[in-house]
């Protein structure tokens, strides 16, 4: 309780909230964008998080509807993404956007501080599905503890994925540029194709401090593969090429239709041989499928321990 009180005291945005709303607000800050925090006429706080879109309008619409249904009252927007409205119209409160860093672009409607003001930079890389524009997909919530700690949030968006080596090299080049600009720490995070390219950028010498790779894949679903050994061999090459230095978190779920099998064993063996000391989250109970890291349940359970390991090397349950 002392730690919670200290956290709340350090958060001006929650200073005027009641105890129930403060607790909801602390939860809200640790979930991914697009997200909205609202107050009902009853004084309670309500949240909606993890919505896709080029801007937060969809999250706002769905969040207000949900809030009004649950509170049975009119609801007021308090915070959109990380922008405290303080009575302003959300569009009028749109924060200025920082310039792109190579092929990295700022998360839309997100207040970033820039390399001199931020504690670091976390870069989200989305998955990919043929015919679907994933450039407006929501970052998974494990990015949020880093933004709470003062990191800026950028994205590595690819409408089409046709050049894997080129994408990995471009991401590595952008990390070098970010460090040259003054970002003290850079963390790469991604799911599926994004998880794969995050690891691949590391093998190309990207000066990263940490990598969070969830359900890494880029060969499609197993049912469509003619030879699963090719996909597994490429995975083995990736994990063998990672050198000690950055803190690595790899996550895999049961029932992943993109998983050829044995990949976490491959990762452990490769990292043991190279001296990398990772966190491997393999088949966590209660999570199933390629997209099990989406939504709010995974970051609520694992977000804090992933962040703690990347930042300090400490292993806290359930990451230990």
Where are these regions (language model features)?
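The feature captures the conserved acid-bearing segment of alpha/beta-hydrolase catalytic domains
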Residues: 216-280
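N-terminal signal peptide c-region/cleavage motif recognized by signal peptidases
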Residues: 10-12
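Secreted/extracellular ectodomain signature
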Residues: 14-108, 120, 132, 142
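C-terminal catalytic histidine-bearing segment of alpha/beta-hydrolase fold enzymes
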Residues: 274-320
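Alpha/beta-hydrolase active-site loop
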Residues: 162-181
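Short, surface-exposed "cap/lid" segments of acyl-processing enzymes
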Residues: 105, 113-146
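Primarily recognizes the serine-hydrolase "nucleophile elbow" in alpha/beta-hydrolase
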Residues: 185-239
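Conserved alpha/beta-hydrolase
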Residues: 145-162
């Amino acid at each position: 309780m002392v730690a919670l009180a200290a956290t709340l005291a350090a958060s001006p945005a929650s200073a005027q909230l009641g105890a129930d709303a403060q607790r909801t607000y602390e939860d809200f800050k640790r979930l991914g964008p697009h997200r909205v925090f609202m107050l009902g006429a009853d004084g309670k706080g309500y949240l909606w998080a993890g919505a896709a879109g080029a801007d937060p309008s969809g999250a706002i619409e769905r969040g207000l509807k949900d809030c009004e249904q649950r509170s049975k009252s009119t609801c007021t927007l308090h915070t959109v993404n990380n922008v405290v409205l303080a009575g302003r119209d959300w569009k009028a409160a749109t924060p200025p956007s920082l310039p792109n860093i190579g092929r990295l672009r700022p998360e839309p409607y997100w207040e970033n501080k820039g390399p001199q003001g931020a504690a670091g930079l976390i870069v989200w890389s989305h998955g990919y599905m043929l015919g679907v524009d994933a450039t407006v997909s929501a970052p998974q919530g494990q990015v949020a503890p880093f933004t709470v700690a003062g990191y800026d949030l950028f994205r590595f968006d690819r409408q089409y994925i046709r050049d894997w080596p080129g994408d990995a090299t471009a991401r590595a080049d952008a990390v070098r540029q970010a460090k040259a600009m003054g970002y003290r720490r850079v963390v790469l995070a991604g799911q599926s194709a994004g998880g794969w390219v995050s690891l691949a950028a590391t093998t190309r010498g990207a000066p990263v401090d940490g990598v969070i790779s969830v359900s890494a894949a880029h060969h499609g679903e197993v049912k469509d593969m003619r030879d699963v050994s090719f996909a597994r061999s490429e995975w083995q090459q990736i994990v063998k090429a990672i050198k000690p230095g950055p803190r690595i978190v790899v996550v895999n779920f049961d029932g992943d239709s993109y998983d050829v099998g044995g990949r976490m064993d491959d990762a452990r063996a490769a990292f043991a041989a190279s001296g990398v000391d990772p966190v491997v989250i393999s088949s966590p109970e209660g999570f199933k499928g390629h997209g099990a890291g989406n939504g709010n349940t995974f970051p609520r359970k694992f977000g804090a321990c992933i962040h703690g390991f990347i930042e300090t090397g400490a292993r806290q349950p359930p990451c230990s």
